[in-house]
Amino acid sequence: MYAVIKTGGQQFKVKQGTILKIEKLEIEPGKKVTFKEVLIVSDGDDIQVGTPFVSKVTVEAKIISQGKGKKVHILKFRRRKHSMKQQGHRQLLTEIEIVKINA
């Protein structure tokens, strides 16, 4: 059984036990979170596609940790001016484990 959930402007295909890194959620590690925006649910040959979401289906997950992603380096170089600007960014992420798909 798998489901496709929407969180943080992205879509993820999840199964029970899947570990994901998603956009930061303001929830402490160890707590549970429920995703109600489920786009697709599949149980073998039975597939339910939502318009836009499947009704009465939720996905429960447990927060494992909060952290940051890999650093992205940005370099703006101005030709013939002997000038450049260097910057970095690390996205805040939440690591979750899918506990249960309630279909």
UniProtKB/Swiss-Prot annotation:
Entry keyword annotation includes rRNA-binding:
yes
The record's section on Pfam families has:
Ribosomal_L21p
Asked if the record carries the keyword NADP, the reply is no
Q: Which GO terms describe its biological process?
A: translation
Which SUPFAM superfamilies does the record cross-reference, listed alphabetically? L21p-like
Gene Ontology CC: one annotated term: ribosome
Question: Which keywords, in A-to-Z order, does the entry hold?
Answer: Ribonucleoprotein, Ribosomal protein, RNA-binding, rRNA-binding
MF terms from GO for this chain are: rRNA binding; structural constituent of ribosome
- What family, per the record? Belongs to the bacterial ribosomal protein bL21 family.
| Subunit structure and binding partners | Part of the 50S ribosomal subunit. Contacts protein L20.
> According to its UniProt entry, what is the function of this protein?
This protein binds to 23S rRNA in the presence of protein L20.
Designated name of the protein: Large ribosomal subunit protein bL21
State the organism named in the record.
Vesicomyosocius okutanii subsp. Calyptogena okutanii (strain HA)
